[in-house]
Amino acid sequence: MRLIPLTTAEQVGKWAARHIVNRINAFKPTANRPFVLGLPTGGTPMTTYKALVEMHKAGQVSFKHVITFNMDEYVGLPKEHPESYYSFMHRNFFDHVDIPAENINLLNGNALDIDAECRQYEEKIRSYGKIHLFMGGVGNDGHIAFNEPASSLASRTRIKTLTHDTRVANSRFFDNDVNQVPKYALTVGVGTLLDAEEVMILVLGSQKALALQAAVEGCVNHMWTISCLQLHPKAIMVCDEPSTMELKVKTLRYFNELEAENIKGL
């Protein structure tokens, strides 16, 4: 596992965007050989999406031959609702870059057959071989996507019941009214994430410090689903300074020395 220790959320966004752009450009995608990118929603990736849009407008990257798969979607929320992840992604990213509409894949939380929707999503991912880079965030309780504590580390795309804490955390997007937050969501599984060639998780804020500690210094544990990254051959944690407050001093010093050349110029 790599840990990229930065200072601010803006630096995390810039580093993550730069890494995505470098991976896409090094891959040299074509129509017949697209780059497959996994994407999250929420507050954490906002600085990354902003930086990606700026880099696209500066001519540094094209998304014309990029296929995207989003991590999750609420169940029962209309697609046009301002807080659906469909709306979020278009508002903050897709509408500002050159990605073709047919290259965008989002789970349908209003599908008549939820199980079939989840199964087809997995099949479509497999049809491209694999996701080359999956970016994500992490919850205060260590959940990735909507894989809440005690999720199977072998799980695939499925419907999940959201914990009260997750709904409270997300209520800031729903006028701070937890009753407006859906109780269920469709989400890729932990196993789906682990199948990706590379996984990059962004960690922001002191409220995520225990989750980061569990991911880096703890044991692999289904109560902290983020710890599954210890099993991945190419995992990256990109974090700001407040999120590192629970890490041991020697752990942080080790990664600072290891990544010194990779965090320059932000």
From Swiss-Prot:
| Residues forming the catalytic site | D72 (proton acceptor), D141 (for ring-opening step), H143 (proton acceptor), E148 (for ring-opening step)
Statement: the UniProt record of this protein carries the keyword Hydrolase: yes
Alphabetic keyword roster: Allosteric enzyme, Carbohydrate metabolism, Disulfide bond, Hydrolase
**Oligomer status and interactors:** Homohexamer; trimer of disulfide-linked dimers.
Q: Where is this site: Part of the allosteric site?
A: S151, R158, K160, T161, Y254
Give the highest taxon in the source lineage.
Bacteria
Question: What is this protein's function?
Answer: Catalyzes the reversible isomerization-deamination of glucosamine 6-phosphate (GlcN6P) to form fructose 6-phosphate (Fru6P) and ammonium ion.
Identify the InterPro entries for this entry: Glc/Gal-6P_isomerase, Glucosamine6P_isomerase, Glucosamine6P_isomerase_CS, NagB/RpiA_transferase-like
Q: Cite a single GO BP annotation.
A: N-acetylglucosamine catabolic process
Family to which the UniProt record says this protein belongs: Belongs to the glucosamine/galactosamine-6-phosphate isomerase family. NagB subfamily.
Q: What regulates this protein's activity? A: Allosterically activated by N-acetylglucosamine 6-phosphate (GlcNAc6P).
Q: In which pathway does it act?
A: Amino-sugar metabolism; N-acetylneuraminate degradation; D-fructose 6-phosphate from N-acetylneuraminate: step 5/5
Q: What class of enzyme is it?
A: hydrolase
Q: Which reaction does it catalyse?
A: alpha-D-glucosamine 6-phosphate + H2O = beta-D-fructose 6-phosphate + NH4(+)
Q: Which Gene3D superfamilies match?
A: 3.40.50.1360
Q: Which organism is it from?
A: Shigella dysenteriae serotype 1 (strain Sd197)
Single GO MF descriptor: glucosamine-6-phosphate deaminase activity
Q: Supply the EC number(s).
A: 3.5.99.6
Q: What's the name of the protein?
A: Glucosamine-6-phosphate deaminase
Which terms in the GO cellular component ontology are assigned?
A: cytosol
